[in-house]
Regions:
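Positively charged, solvent-exposed patches that mediate nucleic-acid binding
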Residues: 1-136
Length: 136
């Protein structure tokens, strides 16, 4: 049985090289309270042992001066993503592609988990549509 509700170390976007490529050459869109950056690529160009979906999250210091607040928001976003990423992973596996994904929180107040969960669902549905469009 595959563990589908996990967000392990290999699924986190931490490589400086990949982050630079994502912000320079990737596509982006906004859906409050997120700014989403992503790059779609085919499986053949990348290493075979990497997961199909790699994820990162950031919260700016402009609106949240305290690290405690930034870390709480990042934890909430990671949890909302972890519980809803399965459809996106299945779609990428079916298409034979992979995606680097980075969320930047653009809100000005600490959100409730239910608010983030709903908006994460909408953003992931938009990403599914973009995957379908790119493989047509």
């Amino acid at each position: 049985m595959v563990k589908s509700y996990t967000l392990g170390k290999s699924e986190r976007l931490k490589s400086r090289k990949r982050l630079e490529a994502l912000f320079k050459g990737g596509k982006s869109f906004s859906h409050f309270p997120f700014r989403v950056y992503y790059i779609l690529s085919s499986e053949s160009k990348t290493e075979a042992h990497t997961p199909p979906l790699v994820f990162g999250v950031g919260v700016g210091t402009r609106n949240f001066k305290k690290a405690v607040d930034r870390n709480r928001i990042k934890r909430l976003i990671r949890e909302a993503y972890r519980l809803q990423k399965q459809l996106l992973v299945q779609k990428l596996n079916a298409r034979g592609g992979r995606m680097d994904l980075f969320f930047i929180f653009t809100g000005k107040e600490i959100p409730d988990y239910s608010f983030l969960f709903q908006h994460m669902q909408t953003v992931l549905q938009q990403l599914e549509q973009r995957i379908d469009q790119s493989y047509e």
